[in-house]
């Protein structure tokens, strides 16, 4: 059998031990204030403490002391209460500080809850806004409540008045959250709207009236190391949320073309300066928290169990860094960056490379670009193993073996690099050097035979003419 309330009672007992200072073996100092806790609870709740305590696991007899200067004592009090009770008191004043501290301590669950809290307060879509501000005559003068509404309300929150053309009802004294501004409260633009768009927009602005319900403390699910407590509504509010989902599905059947959507977007109302300043301030706090989260040290051994769910089963992770690949061959190639292995040597110069394509590119650009070949044996030749030969106006290169066969191996080659070896005239060359002499003789003999034939024909014609004249 499984008892669902066992872990709740266990957390309560641990929290009671912490408050009575029983078996506390970890001391945390923040702004000069000391907090006492159990290292096992901190180890299971925070990636930072997991790394810190795993390095000092040998000194189990003495208590561990850690000092933090990156967040305030009130912020750490809220986080420590969350660790031991599963309840996170979030509000518009402390959500950024709590998120920054959770980022530093590597508490991913608290970060996700803070992001959801901020998103719900800033990025409410049009459907939720219209459903939130469209109330019936029965709700006149009543106070509404929404998700995390208690955390946003302040004593100086302004009252809003709203009149609807459909019902003609008047709502006064409604305590709205400061970051949210209704579209119906903004002044209309100068451009008139199309009648069809107005009718379709009215159909979207007529949801069922919402009945406000008393607020209660409900934890947001079972998270690792606890859960965040936020202000939610009772069962009636849950039913109203389900009704809103059904109406949202019905509203999806209304087809609005792309041009109409662009027209509606072009006729939007300007935002109030109060909302713009609040959104800019929140955006700056969020960016600061994200930068702090990116600046955290990377933990390999201590925090190896954190974030493993984000890596799919079909990926391979590098044991030296956070790089992940899809194929095992890519991981093997990536490991050469850490090991320094270069398994691909160049046969021409002996230089080694980590990747085969780098070797191929090196060979093509260095060794095969302007490749020199011996004119006689057709083998590769360099400036060291060959010599440039000039035969009249023609220049080519021969290797030392071919030069030795031609009898030019004793010639002094101490010339400049640009000065070629000039061959002697044809009548002074040796027969072994003139390797095309046979071809020239054959061509010359053929030409001589043709000349003889032509000469014989010419002589025979002249004799015939002389005989006729006689």
UniProtKB/Swiss-Prot annotation:
It comes from the Eukaryota. The keyword Transcription regulation applies. InterPro entries: BTB/POZ_dom, SKP1/BTB/POZ_sf, Znf_C2H2_sf, Znf_C2H2_type, ZnFinger_BTB_dom_contain. GO terms for molecular function: DNA binding; zinc ion binding. A zinc finger (C2H2-type) spans 316-338, 344-367. Residues 24-92 form the BTB domain. Gene3D superfamilies: Classic Zinc Finger, Potassium Channel Kv1.1, Chain A. GO terms for cellular component: nucleus. Keywords: DNA-binding, Metal-binding, Nucleus, Phosphoprotein, Repeat, Transcription, Transcription regulation, Zinc, Zinc-finger. May be involved in transcriptional regulation. This is Zinc finger and BTB domain-containing protein 8A. It comes from Xenopus tropicalis.
